[in-house]
Every structure is written in structure tokens, then in C-alpha cells.
């Protein structure tokens, strides 16, 4: 029996970038598609996946089974432009992660802005619109983050994904006018992200802690 069916309440429904989520809490997991069904059972509002380094095409084709069943956010890092094009038709949200592409903690922001412009231009080639978010690393300075936020808003990026401890600061910088997705490793951090005003929160929680998070979210005073 699924413990989460009782937590699918109207109060938890949320919308983001034209997408409807049954709740704002998601799970970030390994590339394995086998776990996607489990994530749905846990009650995840969305699932973030990163394509494997090998056999990417086979992996992408496997996503078709889950289309329209789970909101899929695909984290794109290696071979950004090519991978972006491959996953576009199979993703509900694409997260650009330039840090992993460069293999360092915080790539030069000029390199990042060039990458963002490339993927925004690529999106123009498609008939349907898929939102794009930028994952901002721990290593960027406040000035660098401010510059990236300005570029995102001007270039057509739909949101940023930031570590839990930076959610409040980023929202203050944008005066709560630009969507932020928090990235959290604990229940407490996930709750703080949402209470600060994050549109969504992506977690690395295992099943039981994730259940507890949904229970917290379902409480009227949360």
C-alpha cells in the first residue's frame, strides 16, 4: 500500500513554468530509470535525472515510458548543446549544470553565459516550449551570482536551482520576481527552502525521510 496517496491534497498542488505539480517536493536520483516508478510511489512531485556518461541514446529512449506519468527534470552537464538537443523532447524541465561540464566547482561566468545563450537559441528550433533552469554552484561569489541572475532574466532562462542556504539570499536579490528551485539534502533544509519562497525543492532524501517531508508539507500550518 502506498503511504502517500493520502497526502495528495489540493493544498500541495503548485504550478511552475506552465507545469502542474501535485506537490513542490522532488527527488534527485541516479540515472537509473528503474527507480522512477519507485519515486512516483513515494509521491515525488517531480524527479531530477542526469543522463549516464555512456549509452545516452538508449537511456533517453527509456524515458518515453514515463512521459506524462512523472514530471521529469533532466540535469544536463556533459556535451551540453548535444545532450540538450537529445533530451529536449523527453523532458518537462531541463536543468543546465555547467559545473560538471567543466569539472570544476565554479566555472567562469562568461563561459556559463555563453552556454546559456546557446541553449536558449537551440530552444527556438522546437515547436513546443520546455523551461530551462540554471544550476548555480556553491563556489560562486555573491557578485558572480548576481551577474548570473541578471543574465538569466534577460536571456529567457526560466529559473535557477540553488543550494538551500542560498535560497533566501537569491530571492531577496530578485525581489521574489524570479523562480528559484532549492536543492536540499535534509528535511529541515527542504522545508526552509519552501518557507523562504522557493517555487520547488529538489531533494536527495531516501524514501522514509521523503515520506516525512510530505507529511510536514501536508500539515495546515506549513
Residue spans of the language-model regions?
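N-terminal capping/small domains of soluble enzymes
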Residues: 1-81, 214-217
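Alpha-helix-loop-beta-strand connector modules within alpha/beta enzyme cores
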Residues: 56-70, 109-134, 165-180, 210-222
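Hydrophobic faces of well-ordered beta-strands that scaffold small-molecule active sites
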Residues: 23-29, 45-49, 70-76, 94-96, ...
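Glycine/Thr-rich beta-alpha phosphate-binding loop at enzyme active sites
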Residues: 3-7, 98-114, 136-176, 209-216
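Glycine-rich phosphate-binding active-site loops on the catalytic face of alpha/beta enzymes
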Residues: 49-52, 93-102, 159-165, 189-216
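Active-site-proximal loop/turn and secondary-structure-junction residues that shape catalytic pockets
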Residues: 31, 53, 78, 98-102, ...
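Catalytic cores of alpha/beta
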Residues: 36-40, 82-86, 140-154, 170-178, ...
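Metal-dependent enolase-superfamily TIM-barrel catalytic cores that perform enediolate-based chemistry
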Residues: 82-139
Amino acid at each position: 500500500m502506498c503511504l502517500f496517496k493520502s497526502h495528495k491534497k489540493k493544498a500541495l498542488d503548485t504550478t511552475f513554468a506552465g507545469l502542474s505539480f501535485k506537490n513542490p517536493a522532488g527527488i534527485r536520483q541516479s540515472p537509473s530509470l528503474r527507480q522512477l516508478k519507485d519515486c512516483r510511489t513515494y509521491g515525488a512531485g517531480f524527479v531530477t535525472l542526469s543522463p549516464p556518461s555512456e549509452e545516452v541514446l538508449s537511456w533517453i529512449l527509456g524515458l518515453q515510458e514515463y512521459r506524462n506519468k512523472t514530471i521529469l527534470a533532466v540535469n544536463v552537464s556533459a556535451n551540453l548543446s548535444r545532450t540538450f538537443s537529445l533530451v529536449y523532447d523527453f523532458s518537462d524541465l531541463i536543468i543546465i549544470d555547467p559545473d560538471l561540464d567543466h569539472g570544476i566547482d565554479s566555472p567562469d561566468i562568461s563561459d556559463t553565459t555563453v552556454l546559456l545563450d546557446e541553449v536558449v537559441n537551440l530552444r527556438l528550433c522546437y515547436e513546443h516550449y520546455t523551461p530551462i533552469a540554471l544550476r548555480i554552484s556553491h563556489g560562486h561569489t555573491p557578485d558572480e551570482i548576481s551577474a548570473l541572475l541578471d543574465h538569466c532574466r534577460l536571456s529567457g532562462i526560466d529559473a535557477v536551482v540553488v543550494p538551500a542556504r542560498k535560497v533566501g539570499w537569491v530571492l531577496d536579490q530578485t525581489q521574489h520576481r524570479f523562480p528559484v528551485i532549492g536543492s536540499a539534502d535534509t528535511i529541515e533544509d527542504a522545508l526552509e527552502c519552501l518557507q523562504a519562497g522557493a517555487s520547488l525543492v529538489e531533494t536527495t532524501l531516501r524514501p522514509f525521510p521523503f515520506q516525512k517531508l510530505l507529511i510536514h508539507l501536508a500539515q495546515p500550518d506549513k
